[in-house]
Amino acid sequence: DFKHLYEYYPPVAPTKVGTYSRGYYSNDNFFSFVSDINKDGWPDVLTVGLPNTPAYWYENPGKSFNGPGPEQPEHWTRHFVINAVKNEAPTFGDITGDGEPELLMAYDEHYGYVSPNPVAPTLPWIFHPISTHENVIHHYTHGLGFGDIDGDGRHDYIIGDGWTQQPASLQFGEDWQYHQYPFVNRAGDNAYASLNGGGDMYAYDVNGDGLNDIITSLDAHGWGLSWYEQVRKDDEITFKEHIIMSKQAENTDNPYGVQFSQLHAVDLVDIDGDGLKDIVTGKTYRAHDFADEGAREDPVIYYFRLTQKSDGSAEYVPHKVDDDAGIGRQLVSGDLNADGLPDIVAANKNGTFVFTQRRRSVDQDEWKKAQPMRLKGF
């Protein structure tokens, strides 16, 4: 019922960025991830702040949380992780395959990941660069993810410009092999064009051919959502783009007429229980106040239901979840009420929102009326 509030660290004043009339941002908490970092049986909280600011983790004191929070909060002990996290879509997952999650990010001139010392997790975390050849990476660069692209059983590193292949050995300082591919458009005269990209990026077998494809939004402050079909020719890996939502304000690609901007966060989860992972995303609420394209349109949340067809093709069918909340820099799906159905959590400048999934029995006519309608000409 979400009636009880627990404050695990004191409020921090927001940071004003740029010249926007309300361009304020959470300096200390752009992203939050939950994991038992010190292995004491209690989940802790890892926070990542505004790009190029530190990350910390907060140690769960291991007390009961069944009643209302205390009037005088007992704040959790804060532990330093790293002094600066670059990229606007850092992610927390087990890229190394050791059973423990790492924080994927950029630092200085390198993409890589940080992980705690397993013997002393309260010490600063260790940064593991996956390459030594980049120029300085701008902290506002968008788009990052991981997954097994080449099918060798090891997770690879995905960015807007391509993917980096994990080697068989994770010897410290060893370069991962980089494969360039323009998943997002970073060309143009705009001063920020080189930073373009979406949010979370995924490797997932969309069309069921046994090869993992790439799923990404294309511009976190503009338009576009695509999946890139992996194509093999001999030993070469390349991709074929399939547009889910158009790359400009006018819809020219979505057969159901769905078009919205500012997809700054994307989640991948099986919403309907058919065994296929669907896309959950939405329009960011006032990402740059009202300066972004489409900023004054409804702050919607959608899930795109994946359907695989007998001819080997695939389609994402859009279903609206909400048209008033919007999303923020992070979007999380999970079963909050233990009913076996995934729910959705979103937080932004508009508030914090929980969307609990509910199912009911209907007749055939009502079911048909609820289905998205294809536009003529598609």
Q: What is each stretch, according to the model?
A:
Residues 1-378:
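Beta-propeller-forming repeat regions
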